[in-house]
């Protein structure tokens, strides 16, 4: 175990749970063959609201000033838990010394004297971090992975995915807004494993020459036709047997029915497009009426073993 180090000042941390599961934030729903059954429904519509994107939550997501901090590996490869007076989700900074969105950084000294810098991952500003703290079984984004990220915005979560996949991996980050795209491009100048693409994710043919086959697609486009957008991109870029992670915002699809009904409808749409959803977790309390669905794509049928 690494020796304790002193964390700097900042906002409060986020409870990560001892096993990195974030037990206090609701479980997920398994779609058959998963690790669990129905571990927890998406929260009711009246619950405490997660802070709007880009604001709220602990402002810098750091550790309490003056506390001793120990960094331990999370069960998801490339993710870590910083434990002090408050626990926080962190990733190993691919570009030490550089912050992306004014996030708190923690420096840990190894026994051999070398230092490793980690960046606090704020779940109020990242759907993927919220899903991890919600107890998602597998995000499929790991060191060396090639990821297509749809709806990259200014690159907050993309930067942490960049940390996760490391120098051997690659993140193709697609964003339609030119304003957000400027921030994304600036971030990518220092992160050589991020390839920013300022295009509409509805038209993957426009960037087919820029993107290779990928292991995982992460989608956070918040559009009524987001299942179709994911399917279009998967048909171009997602390898057979690859995986997807999609953030679903119920109000963007149908604000007239319960969030749970919207999630069920979207899962059915995904199943019709050769996706095999494996689990669903709520993003409460970080985001209201959001769910994250994870699964496989064009999964090979299991071979029946002949009787001996």
Curated annotation (Swiss-Prot):
GO biological process, one term: methylation
Membrane-crossing segments per the record: none
Intracellular or extracellular location(s): Nucleus, Nucleolus
GO cellular component terms attached to this protein's record: nucleolus; plastid; ribonucleoprotein complex
Keywords: Methyltransferase, Nucleus, Ribonucleoprotein, RNA-binding, rRNA processing, S-adenosyl-L-methionine, Transferase
Chain intervals for the UniProt region annotation (Disordered): 1-68
Stated induction or repression of this protein's expression: Repressed by abscisic acid (ABA).
Annotated SMART domains: Fibrillarin
Tissue: Expressed in roots, leaves and flowers. Expressed in stems.
Binding locations of S-adenosyl-L-methionine: 156-157, 175-176, 200-201, 220-223
Quaternary state and interactors: Component of box C/D small nucleolar ribonucleoprotein (snoRNP) particles. Interacts with SKP1A.
Function: S-adenosyl-L-methionine-dependent methyltransferase that has the ability to methylate both RNAs and proteins. Involved in pre-rRNA processing. Utilizes the methyl donor S-adenosyl-L-methionine to catalyze the site-specific 2'-hydroxyl methylation of ribose moieties in pre-ribosomal RNA. Site specificity is provided by a guide RNA that base pairs with the substrate. Methylation occurs at a characteristic distance from the sequence involved in base pairing with the guide RNA.
Family designation: Belongs to the methyltransferase superfamily. Fibrillarin family.
The record's note on its domains: The N-terminal DMA/Gly-rich region (also called GAR domain) is rich in Gly and Arg and functions in nucleolar targeting.
Name assigned to this protein: rRNA 2'-O-methyltransferase fibrillarin 1
Provenance organism: Arabidopsis thaliana
Phylogenetic classification of the source organism: Eukaryota, Viridiplantae, Streptophyta, Embryophyta, Tracheophyta
Name of the gene encoding the protein in the UniProt record: FIB1
């Amino acid at each position: 175990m690494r020796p304790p180090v002193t964390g700097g000042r900042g906002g409060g941390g986020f409870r990560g749970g001892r096993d990195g599961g974030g037990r206090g934030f609701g479980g997920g729903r398994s779609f058959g063959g998963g690790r669990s059954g129905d571990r927890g429904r998406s929260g009711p519509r009246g619950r405490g609201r997660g802070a709007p994107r880009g604001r709220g939550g602990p402002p810098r997501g750091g550790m309490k000033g003056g506390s001793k901090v120990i960094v331990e590996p999370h069960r998801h490869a490339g993710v870590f838990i910083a434990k002090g007076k408050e626990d926080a989700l962190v990733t190993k900074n691919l570009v030490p010394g550089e912050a992306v969105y004014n996030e708190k950084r923690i420096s840990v000294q190894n026994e051999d004297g070398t230092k490793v810098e980690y960046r606090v991952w704020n779940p109020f500003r990242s759907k993927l971090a919220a899903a991890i703290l919600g107890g998602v079984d597998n995000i499929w984004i790991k060191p060396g992975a090639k990821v297509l990220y749809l709806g990259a915005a200014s690159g907050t979560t993309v930067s942490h995915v960049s940390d996760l996949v490391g120098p051997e991996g690659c993140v193709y980050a697609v964003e339609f807004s030119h304003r957000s795209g400027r921030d994304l491009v600036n971030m990518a100048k220092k992160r050589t494993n991020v390839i920013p693409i300022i295009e509409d994710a509805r038209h993957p043919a426009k960037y087919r020459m820029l993107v290779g086959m990928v292991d995982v697609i992460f989608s956070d486009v918040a559009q009524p036709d987001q299942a179709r957008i994911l399917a279009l991109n998967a048909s171009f870029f997602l390898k057979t047997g690859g995986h997807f992670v999609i953030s679903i915002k119920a109000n963007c699809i149908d604000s007239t029915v319960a969030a749970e009904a919207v999630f069920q409808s979207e899962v059915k749409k995904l199943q019709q497009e050769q996706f095999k959803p494996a689990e669903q977790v709520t993003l409460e309390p970080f985001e209201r009426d959001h769910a994250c669905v994870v699964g496989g794509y064009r999964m090979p049928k299991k071979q029946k073993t002949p009787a001996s």
